[in-house]
UniProtKB/Swiss-Prot annotation:
One of its GO terms (molecular function) is glycerophosphodiester phosphodiesterase activity. It comes from Sinorhizobium fredii (strain NBRC 101917 / NGR234). One of its GO terms (biological process) is N-acylethanolamine metabolic process. This is Uncharacterized protein y4eD. InterPro entries: GP_PDE_dom, PLC-like_Pdiesterase_TIM-brl. Keywords: Plasmid. It comes from the Bacteria.
Amino acid sequence: MRVALISTSIFALCCSSNVRAEAVLPVNPSPYLVGAITRNMFRVPKPDQDLVLLSAHRGSWEVYPENSAYALQDAWNSQIEAVEVDARFTADKEVILSHDYRMERESTGTGFLYDQNYSQVQQADLRDRHGRVFKDSRGRNAKFMTFSAALDLLAQYVTDDGHGYVMIIDVKGAVDDQDPTDPIELTQRCLDILAAKKNPKLSKAVVFKLKAKDAVDIGTFLNRTTYDPNVMGGLIVVENPDDQNVKDSNYDPHEDTIYDQWNVAPFPVQFEMNQFYKGDGLQAYLDYVDQKQGFATYHESNYYPEGVANSAGKCCFEHNTDPRSVAHGGIVPDYRGEPEMAIVNRTNLITTDWPDVVADMLRQLGRRNTSKLSR
């Protein structure tokens, strides 16, 4: 296995894109310490805590294209302490940032990302959330970013004295039988690219996010990659990767052996859940008194038409949502876009497409004391 990892590392170093990221917006210095961000991210949440962290999902893409350099910088320049980006392979194993595995919704390109080389992908221009081809005030289009370029962009915010922001990497797996992506291989490639930067402070600003249903999955991840919890910023586990995983209202997390496994993990692990509707049994875990690890929630935004675009770039993704709701026109409503549902929960981190709105809500509730991130 170690030989395989070394081979992967050599491949990554010789084949990764050499294009460095240009700052498309001004680089405003961060008032936050990276160590303070990750420390608060992975502590045990308390009902009376006065700081809930925010992660801008795919950056700030109200105006800018999602997962673009513009979206990342706009979030950081707005002093949102973390952004979450999506990592995928192209056909020639370049790691790029893209939520979808089809190109049409996000860009002027067509077809599957895993069928196209990076040089082909770079011919496409990114769209904004309304489907319009993006141009900035200087007439520049936005392009798909490589993971390497995203790291270079983050590095411009990470300083020698420890200030900076955090980037969370959501590693995407295979989406169909034709997609050859192995999420472990993709994660290792990301680790190789990061290691090649030879920047320990940058490594501490990167958090990986993966799907895992139990401790066996985590063990597989640790055995098959060079991930080192002493080097990286941290690890977030998506506990409910199955969109049908909605708990009954009488669900008792104290009887769930999976959560007991997370509680005894030998290093900090934060696990994240999508809460599907108010009263979902997952709410019980948010108030779980025996919780010993960090906890995060995510809610999606219901842009018109109602629903959430899936990774094929199609609308709408039929989640198993509130059984009391009634679907209209064949679309199953998805109520996770209500930020009010997330801010009342006991959680360390909220990943949101509305970081500015949720930040204001938390501030009004006395739960956005970001002065803690400066010490």
